């Protein structure tokens, strides 16, 4: 029972609960980050050591901050936004703390990457610089103001590779194992195993899974 004679007690207890909850998640965050570092080391032929990946790769810096910010997002959204903006300022990689990102995630190079609030990214996904996972449009309320807290960003399933400069917009699904080529503009879902490639004159889709 909280006493009215001690108005500070309630926020103190809330803060203690948040800190304890966060501390309890640190082992799982560490496991996720181990997988992210391993994905970067194994996914980049220019990486010569795990130490190099940890110390030199902006994508790793950004995902470390994101894993922490995402864990805090539900309870302390302002703090999580501050954390994500520190990473954004340092790396040029803008990941909203609300985005859900699976294990083994690798951002190579990274400058200009944008990942929106309601994105859902599966496991072992690799993306390159200047990729945008954003909203196709912003919905409005009856009074003309922008709606808040609605789903508007892509789902990227497991084992997808998205090359530099690709723009993927709206609540669409990029099927498992797909490859999205550089500079592709995509606003529709694609099946598992698709290759979406951009030629100088046209964009074309190839599905490399039988059936």
Model-assigned labels for residue ranges:
Residues 88-204, 208:
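Structural signal for interior beta-strand "rungs" in well-ordered beta-sheet cores
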